[in-house]
Amino acid sequence: MILTRSDIGRARTWIAALLSSLAICAPAATAQAPSLFVDSRSTTAEAADRLDGRAKDDALFLARFPSASWLAYGSPDIVEAKARDIVSRALAARQVPVLVAYNISYRDCALYSAGGAADSGAYHDWIGGLARGIGDRPAIVILEPDGLGVIPWHRTLTGEFEGCRPEGQGEAAAARRYEELRGAVAILSALPNVHIYLDGTGSGWLAPGEIAARLIRADVAKASGFFLNVSNFESDDRIIPYARWVSDCIALVTRGGLDPRECPSQFSPASFENTASWTATDAAYDRLFARLRLTRAPERQKHAVIDTSRNGQGSWYPPAGKYRDAEVWCNPPGRGLGRLPSLESGNRYVDAFLWIKVPGESDGACLRGTAGPVDPERSVEAPPAGQWFAAQARELIELANPPLASE
């Protein structure tokens, strides 16, 4: 990739903000680009302690790279203590931690990662504990994976109900989800050295207009931007253009009054299957900026952070009709690590490439529409969500793209 002056300036602005945060919070030291926190007490390192042989070696190898710390349960006091411990150790190392807040009520629509706060009040208190734990120390906060992609009793822009429709709840559940996210953004954005990102789903999921409307309603204006591809597998050539389109769509809607349903997408005028056709969507955005007499300004628009922990081989496409529900996001076979985590993306729309999903940790049982308990694609009973899956860790390392220099 050839970097323009604007690209370089954009990266310098992002890094300067993090450097400033570190300088304010830490003793004086020589200025250098900040790095992401490599936690010696990560869940990957903990998994290595319980393993032996090749599985242990794989976990120790993966533990050398920075990955996110997931905060997904516990009382406000517990999450406060956990967050304080992580950000304090990161600050001492002059590194930037990535914290995943994953405790919103009715999380994951009661699927493999079910759980979360009991209600909106409990969630507000939990976020308050997280904020107290972070304090004035630098951190990147990934606020609620699937928080905007899977909303109970939510209607799309075309008025259709989505699939998450739990019994005993109604359309008020969707309004509560937005209230909870806006409340969390308000609390966390008051912290001086935190970069907050909201759920932006991915190019294999929602059209840019659909997710842009949700991000705007969730107060992305007060956040740094949105995260993409978390716990997913979309390749760089798909997810990076999508980041640009979501950012542009937000700008067109908020600055130009565009109806988000008019935002071009990976489905139109482009063809989803053919990424070569995606230049048609780029051109459509150019025309919209011209029509509304707006100047595209990536440096002032909302930016993405992208999860590259498992996207080296792209998404999995099983034969059509093989499974009643293929669950292509759930421990798919033959995937690989993607590009290494970095705060220097070289892209005007992307703040960082991160390993948000911890590579090597299971997505869940992955029954693919069967009665289980065996994953029919792998012919094994997969570990519960978040537990170490040694066979998958081995695949990710072997099939890494770009290839890893050494193991």
Predicted regions and their residues:
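Bacterial N-terminal signal peptides
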Residues: 14-25
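Structural recognition of the beta-strand scaffold that forms the well-ordered cores
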Residues: 35-38, 69-72, 96-101, 138-144, ...
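Substrate-binding cleft of extracellular glycoside hydrolase catalytic domains
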Residues: 88-196, 210-222
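Surface-exposed substrate-engagement region within the catalytic domains
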Residues: 46-58, 206-372
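N-terminal carbohydrate-binding/catalytic regions of secreted carbohydrate-active enzymes
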Residues: 33-133, 357-384, 400-401
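Boundary at the C-terminal end of the N-terminal hydrophobic targeting segment
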Residues: 25-33
